[in-house]
């Protein structure tokens, strides 16, 4: 009997699992303010769900009755919106292409004189070398 501890109460065992100190004041205030807010939002969500279900119940027969009109109208609107979006995309593509082309032409126009000078120097060097070679050949022909 001495080896069995009977002096512990069941509440002491439960309290040993609980933390020593309780929640802070800010935690209590957060729960007190957020709990009613959550309840109000849950009620609003339920009301919106109820309204949606009632609206579908009322509108479904109207959709069925007017579907020969609504389906082609919806398709027409969808195609028109798709056309406008595609037109806008093509317009943006055209503007960006023209912008790239203008920038390319400006860059080429700025570097064109440099390229012409480089080509002129190469032609002059080639002509000068050919002239020297022709002079050498003529001197070789003159001196037998």
Swiss-Prot record:
One of its GO terms (biological process) is seed maturation. It is found in: Lipid droplet; Membrane. Keywords: Acetylation, Lipid droplet, Membrane, Transmembrane, Transmembrane helix. Residues 124-144 are annotated as: Disordered. Its main location: other. The modification N-acetylalanine is found at residue 2. Expressed in seeds (at protein level). Pfam families: Oleosin. GO terms for cellular component: membrane; monolayer-surrounded lipid storage body. A motif (Proline-knot) lies at residues 61-72. It is a multi-pass membrane protein. The chain crosses the membrane at residues 28-48, 53-73, 75-95. May have a structural role to stabilize the lipid body during desiccation of the seed by preventing coalescence of the oil. Probably interacts with both lipid and phospholipid moieties of lipid bodies. May also provide recognition signals for specific lipase anchorage in lipolysis during seedling growth. PANTHER family: OLEOSIN, OLEOSIN 20.3 KDA. The proline-knot motif may be involved in the targeting to oil bodies. Belongs to the oleosin family. This is Oleosin H2. It comes from Sesamum indicum (Oriental sesame).
């Amino acid at each position: 009997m001495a080896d069995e501890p009977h002096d512990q109460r069941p509440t002491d065992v439960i309290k040993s699992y609980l933390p020593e100190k309780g929640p802070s004041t800010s935690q209590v205030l957060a729960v007190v303010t957020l709990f009613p807010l959550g309840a109000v939002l849950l009620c609003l969500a339920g009301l919106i769900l109820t309204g949606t279900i009632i609206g579908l119940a009322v509108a479904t027969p109207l959709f069925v009755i007017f579907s020969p009109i609504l389906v082609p109208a919806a398709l027409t609107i969808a195609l028109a919106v798709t056309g406008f979006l595609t037109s806008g995309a093509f317009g943006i593509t055209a503007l960006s292409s023209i912008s790239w082309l203008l920038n390319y032409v400006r860059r080429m126009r700025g570097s064109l004189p440099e390229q012409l000078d480089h080509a002129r120097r190469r032609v002059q060097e080639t002509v000068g070398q050919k002239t020297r070679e022709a002079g050498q050949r003529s001197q070789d022909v003159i001196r037998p």
